[in-house]
Amino acid sequence: MSPSVALAVLALLSLSGLEAIQRTPKIQVYSRHPPENGKPNFLNCYVSGFHPSDIEVDLLKNGEKMGKVEHSDLSFSKDWSFYLLYYTEFTPNEKDEYACRVNHVTLSGPRTVKWDRDM
């Protein structure tokens, strides 16, 4: 076998090994600034440490998807796991509940993490 063919086979084997790795996402929900009722803020959902890259993330207000949600570009860490930041402007108050819902192949179903205004 020529050296270039051997190198190509080795590269394909190493890439296929990367696809076999699955890592469950870590989900963190927090506000950009300390929350004050009636004062505009940003709700953030930072999802990290997951593999493969295909993932669904929704920000929720009282269980319903929020509009005008933006997100960072998909990025990866040194260990080849991925991370993303989803965020939207919101105005906290005492009655509304906010959360982040994530669905990934490593989860048995969507996982919802509530925003804790005291964190």
Swiss-Prot record:
InterPro entries reported in the protein's UniProt record: B2Microglobulin, Ig-like_dom, Ig-like_dom_sf, Ig-like_fold, Ig/MHC_CS, Ig_C1-set, MHC/Immunoglobulin
Annotated S-S bridges: 45-100
Subcellular location: Secreted
Keywords assigned: Disulfide bond, Immunity, Immunoglobulin domain, MHC I, Secreted, Signal
Domain Ig-like C1-type: 25-114
Signal sequence, renumbered to the chain: 1-20
Gene3D superfamilies linked: Immunoglobulins (2.60.40.10)
Major site of localization recorded for this protein: secreted
This protein's record includes keyword Disulfide bond: yes
GO BP annotations listed: antigen processing and presentation of peptide antigen via MHC class I; immune response
GO terms for cellular component: extracellular region; MHC class I protein complex
Subunit details: Heterodimer of an alpha chain and a beta chain. Beta-2-microglobulin is the beta-chain of major histocompatibility complex class I molecules.
PANTHER family: BETA-2-MICROGLOBULIN, MHC CLASS II-RELATED
Summary of the function given for this chain in its UniProt record: Component of the class I major histocompatibility complex (MHC). Involved in the presentation of peptide antigens to the immune system.
Family: Belongs to the beta-2-microglobulin family.
Stated name of the protein: Beta-2-microglobulin
Gene: B2M
